[in-house]
Amino acid sequence: MNSMNQDNRDNVSSSIFWDKCYTENTTGWDLGQVTPVFKDWCDKLVKKSKIFVPGAGNGYDPLYFSKKGHKVLAVDFAEKAVETMNFNANKENLEIDIVKCDLFDLESKYYKKFDYVIEYTCFCAINPKRRKEYVDMMHNLLKDKGELIGLFLPLNKSEDEGG
């Protein structure tokens, strides 16, 4: 692995890196709307649920879930992303918990509180050395019969190559 790859992996663990992405609008993964597969999933949910969205970014998915009556906690550590989520939540008069923090520092008061964790772009952005820690945290947040629902896209790379 070359030093550039290592530098990039170290950068993704920094809120400064992500805040710069949102401030400079270099968020190529951002669809600019709710993720279609999560919209369809949410529209089919019968029971109002408690949903956790890690690395929520601009918040299209958690805001949509809230609009549909679910209790939502959206977490991101990029200041600009959190500002955008709060602005849009206030504009739409939505009840949603938005927390600016490193998800690895999430308080234990949230443990075993969620029916669902929605994973889309957070796991792939985590330094591979911390992915087991991420899995453990998501397990801690889910209720005993809770489910992690995610989109995982194969990159045809090994973990050592950033996959």
Predicted regions, residues:
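A conserved beta-strand element that flanks and buttresses the S-adenosyl-L-methionine
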Residues: 118
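Short catalytic micro-motifs in class I SAM-dependent methyltransferases
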Residues: 121, 125
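Class I (Rossmann-like) S-adenosyl-L-methionine-dependent methyltransferase catalytic domain
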Residues: 2-52, 57-110, 126-163
